[in-house]
Amino acid sequence: MKKKQNLLENIVHGIFLILGLITVACVLVITVYLVVSGIPAIREIGLVDFLFGEIWASTASEPTYGILPFILTSIYGTAGAIAIGVPIGFLTAVYLAKMASSKVKAVMGQAVSMLAGIPSVGYGLVGMMGLVPGIRKVFHVPDGASLLASIIVLAIMILPSIIKMSVTALEAVPKEYEDASLALGATPEETWFRVSVPAAGSGIAAAVVLGVGRAIGEAMAVMMVAGNAANMPNSLFQSVCFLTTAVAKEMAYSSGLQRQALFSIALVLFLFIMLINAVLNFFLKGEKK
């Protein structure tokens, strides 16, 4: 009987090991494919010209492949979305975890879950039909499809991730911490923000980094509201193009060096995501220490 149990445990262990190796293999395959496909264009164009060139004209008679506008747009767009989405998401999470009644928490929790379930094209469609014309009318600009529209859409899209993960982190704080703070004379608000929030810091940091990853990797929604012009993002009302949308809009008809350059853009985006994951691990390890 014991031998059969050990055999079963070994089989289960082997299955999980294989599944884990498959996951690792997928990451390695994607990494190798992007590197192999993206490096040739960087070699031909030149790393400096590719990363810091301000003009992208892939279909011109004399093509130019500078992706600095895409890089800056992705950075500005993500930073703007985080600047708007993190405070709203964080304060909402504190309210749901510490202040809201069970009924309010259930209703708002369901609303957050529904917001998370809306597909990217849904956000993009609402932004294109409502937000873009609204920006055009309110700010009296020729076209509302802009960096500002992209930031607002991305800020809304990252809210569910930030709220859910932050609520989970705050609810995981031992109740004894709060009881001790209250016993020492602290108010509930002081306890929430000076005891519970620092104790849940690693989870909240993970939520923010996840939001950054969601924002920088989004393509469909921003493609519908950004304008998709390869301009330097010198204004919130400028029609712009992100790293993701640059690949998505041109890949279908690309060929030759243009296609290789798009893979190079994907490689740059992949490195951005890896950097974000490294930052997440740094925060988590620092919190554990």
Q: Where is each model-derived feature located?
A:
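N-terminal, non-cleaved signal-anchor transmembrane helix
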Residues: 1-68, 72-75, 263-289
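Transmembrane alpha-helix signature in integral membrane proteins
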Residues: 67-95
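Interhelical loop and adjacent transmembrane-helix boundary motif
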Residues: 222-270
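Generic hydrophobic transmembrane alpha-helix motif, especially the helices
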Residues: 113-155
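Glycine/proline-centered hinge or cleavage motifs at structural transition points of membrane proteins
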Residues: 119, 184-185, 198
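C-terminal transmembrane helix and the adjacent membrane-cytosol boundary/short C-terminal tail
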Residues: 167-171, 175, 182, 249-289
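Cytoplasmic-entry segments and transmembrane alpha-helices of multi-pass inner-membrane transporters
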Residues: 13, 88-127
